[in-house]
Curated annotation (Swiss-Prot):
This is Waprin-Rha1. Residues 1-24 form the signal peptide. Keywords: Antibiotic, Antimicrobial, Disulfide bond, Secreted, Signal. Belongs to the venom waprin family. Pfam families: WAP. Coiled coil: none annotated. It is found in: Secreted. Disulfide bonds join C32-C62, C45-C66, C49-C61, C55-C71. SUPFAM superfamilies: Elafin-like (SSF57256). Residues 25-75 form the WAP domain.
Length: 76
């Protein structure tokens, strides 16, 4: 019984670790702008995306100055 619980927990942990790898594979080119500045860029204080695939054209899903995720142009 304990072995089953252990294997189930191990499987859940491994699946959780694979989530970031899958989302990174569908990412768009470029990198998110740096929001760790003395005066962070303004942003909509609402999450509008979860992954790059939620954003139009070349935009990426990045943290904004308000701490939420939103579509933005990648930094150059």
């Amino acid at each position: 019984m304990q072995a089953r619980v252990f294997l189930l927990l191990l499987g859940v942990i491994l699946l959780g670790m694979m989530g970031p790898m899958v989302s990174a594979q569908d990412g768009k080119a470029g990198s998110c702008p740096d929001v760790n500045q003395p005066i962070p860029p303004l942003g909509v204080c609402k999450t509008t995306c979860a992954t790059d695939s939620n954003c139009p054209d070349i935009q990426k899903c990045c943290k904004n100055g308000c701490g939420h995720m939103s579509c933005t142009r990648p930094s150059t």
